[in-house]
Amino acid sequence: TLLSPRTLRRLLRPQLAAVQSLLNETVNLWILEGIYVRNFDGIESTRELAVRVNAYDRIPAYRSAGGKALLASLTNREVEQMHAQGLPKWHSERVTSIAALKRHLHTVRQHGYATNLEEASLGVCGVGVAVHSPDGSTLVALSSGVPSTRFSPARRKEIAEALIESASTMSARLAGHDRSEIDG
């Protein structure tokens, strides 16, 4: 049984708030919709310079850290099939082909997290990780958007570690939820 975005928001919001408080960076939850990802929950950083929630409600998955985390859960064949018409054009051209995307997703799978280096928006970087359902499939992505001025290698590592831990907590919460919390 699939969980609705509303149910996912209710189940995952406490951990989303906890990781936002820990990092004081903007954090978001994403779902895959075809070749796009959609933001269905987020909490903004309280810093003066911060990434805004819903800056992109829907974006090509290969352009966001959360989207790449979701794409990395698929096989290369699935990625090829879903992008049979090619990659949607976007104003940043860091990844320009399916072959380049597959190479990038290989790195994401190795590291356990995805990055976005100003690929969705100039001045914005991010880290994204997969959140797994009780059956082990990837359900949603958890990401943090960070102004590029704060996105040092050390900060990227710190954010990745916090998101990986939070995603594990979220997965455990999903595995332990009461069946009555499932929508439809």
Language model region names:
Residues 56, 151-152, 179:
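Sparse recognition of residues in long alpha-helices and their boundaries
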